[in-house]
Amino acid sequence: MGVSGDTEGNPGCSGITNGNGTFYSMSSTRFRDIKDGTTNTLVVGERGIPSDWGWGWYLCGGTECEHYISTERGLSRGQNVPSWQGTLRRFWSWHDGGLHFILGDGSVRFFSYNMDFTTYRDMSTINGNEVVSF
């Protein structure tokens, strides 16, 4: 799933239309737009399917279904997700301890579910001028 930034979209299922990350409805993000540096910017993250095979991603209508998620709700451990409600609008996987993200420089990194929440959110934006260290 694409990373839309650090704020959620319309709870009425219209998707994320004004994200500050790489992917959101009608976005046209280019490499030159990633001012925080491609090495420090999350682009695509893992998204597991819940054990009950409920909604793998948020149910929505129209043409703006979420194929991208914000980091506002934090990371969710797949092992602790008892039903589909616990998986909505979160990045997570069934891996022990964390999940994979593709960064703007094309690298793939494994991030712990215990990573600092502020760092996680800072890495989801493309031009927040945050200094990220991990």
Task: Describe each PLM feature range.
Residues 1-134:
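Surface-exposed loop/linker segments characteristic of extracytoplasmic
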